[in-house]
């Protein structure tokens, strides 16, 4: 495998450049090993929700929301297993294909194609788009995606194949990224259908003269911050792609909802219902990633101001003493883990999106990438899922960290190639 080559550096920047080159070389090897693992392991997996996806787990979780005392006793065995025997997931639900993971894999392979010029990586990306067209929610006219299991929430059960505005935008991004590399009419038609779904099937709820929250599914009453952020980004992008001003009008109201509900310290609660007022790492990243993309597309000044406050809160409250991502700054309940692969993946994504506007994130980016390569890569090529208080959760879960980290590192490699590195040789390919 050919190492990445960087342009000649000045003496002042030589040490940083050498470190970056070494990190890029390691990323190439890790991604190569991961694609081989993925080919062996397959594209279905268990999930962080597996304990509660089957009949027993769903009943226990529903009881927890209905009766705290009885419910706590009911879910306690699953929480114990999650903390001390994660492999017990296999007794609770079968391996499943997750659309959100397929979307991340599609984007990851598209980034590898951009970084390497290897056409087989684009073919891998298209493979996952093909799977996504199969897994759409077929009861809806327009293209949309949800979870492949019944999800018990505080507000009721979201049935399998209920469209989620926190999943569909990732699929939109995957199709958009591949469309820009391989501009087929079928990709554009799919993108147009997704935008129609997001604008029509997902509902708006006025919260002020200038803002509206949106529903999480076609059926709820809204109020979740990251849902509005996701939808605002999708429709902002679609408004430009399809020259549709109506999409921007909807997107702008959702954007204003997100901006108006930023806390004075720069954080965002999960929701505005007065109940789900926790602040965690990856949901914070979800919101800020959407804002970063909207600002990149529009130059919206208020969005940049909110991002500045958000970055300040993020760096000051969602990293531990070692400078690594921690799950919560304001937790909703007792947690059974110290660190999460998902948090690291979203941190890398966010830093890559924002380091041009907030250079201090460049240092965070390099630190977290180095940490992931040193501590989270398993011998088989996959990633650890969680750092528990005792040991690790090593169950590979495509939706819960594997696909997100693959995409993040591929994004990192692609961005490195844009910054002057020669294209790496990436010879390991998934079999067809």
Please annotate each region the language model reported.
Residues 2-432:
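Glycan-recognition and catalytic cores of secretory/periplasmic carbohydrate-active enzymes
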């Amino acid at each position: 495998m050919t190492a990445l080559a960087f342009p000649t550096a000045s003496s002042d920047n030589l040490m940083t450049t050498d470190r970056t080159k070494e990190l890029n070389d390691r990323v190439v090897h890790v991604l190569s090993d991961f694609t081989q693992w993925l080919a062996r392991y397959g594209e279905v997996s268990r999930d962080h929700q597996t304990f509660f996806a089957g009949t027993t787990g769903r009943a226990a979780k529903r009881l927890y929301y209905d009766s705290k005392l009885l419910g706590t006793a009911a879910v306690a065995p699953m929480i114990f297993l999650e903390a001390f025997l994660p492999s017990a997931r296999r007794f609770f639900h079968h391996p499943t294909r997750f659309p959100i993971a397929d979307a991340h894999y599609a984007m990851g392979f598209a980034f590898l194609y951009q970084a390497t010029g290897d056409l087989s990586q684009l073919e891998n990306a298209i493979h996952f788009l093909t799977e996504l067209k199969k897994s759409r929610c077929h009861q809806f006219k327009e293209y949309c995606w949800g979870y492949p299991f019944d999800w018990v929430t505080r507000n009721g059960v979201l049935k399998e194949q209920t469209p989620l505005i926190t999943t569909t935008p990732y699929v939109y991004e995957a199709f958009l990224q591949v469309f820009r590399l391989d501009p087929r009419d079928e990709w554009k038609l799919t993108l147009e259908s997704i935008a129609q779904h997001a604008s029509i099937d997902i509902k708006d709820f006025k919260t002020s003269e200038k803002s509206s929250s949106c529903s999480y599914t076609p059926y709820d009453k809204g109020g979740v911050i990251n849902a509005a952020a996701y939808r605002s980004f999708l429709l902002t992008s679609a408004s430009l792609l399809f020259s549709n001003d109506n999409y921007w009008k909807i997107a702008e109201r959702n954007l204003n909802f997100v901006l108006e509900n930023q806390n004075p310290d720069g954080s965002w609660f999960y929701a505005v219902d007065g109940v789900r007022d926790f602040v965690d790492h990856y949901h914070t990243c979800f919101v800020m990633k959407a804002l970063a993309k909207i600002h990149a597309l529009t130059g919206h000044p208020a969005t940049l101001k909110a991002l500045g406050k958000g970055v300040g809160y993020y760096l000051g409250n969602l990293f531990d003493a070692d400078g690594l991502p921690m799950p919560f700054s304001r937790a909703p309940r007792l947690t059974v883990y110290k660190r999460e692969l998902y948090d690291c993946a979203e941190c890398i994504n966010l830093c890559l999106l924002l380091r041009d506007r907030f250079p201090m994130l460049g240092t965070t980016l390099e630190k977290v990438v180095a940490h992931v390569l040193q501590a989270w890569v398993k011998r088989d090529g996959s990633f650890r899922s969680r750092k528990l208080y005792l040991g690790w959760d090593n169950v590979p879960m495509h939706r819960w960290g594997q696909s997100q980290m693959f995409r993040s590192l591929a994004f990192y490699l692609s961005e490195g190639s844009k910054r002057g590195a020669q294209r790496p040789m990436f010879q390991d390919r998934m079999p067809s």
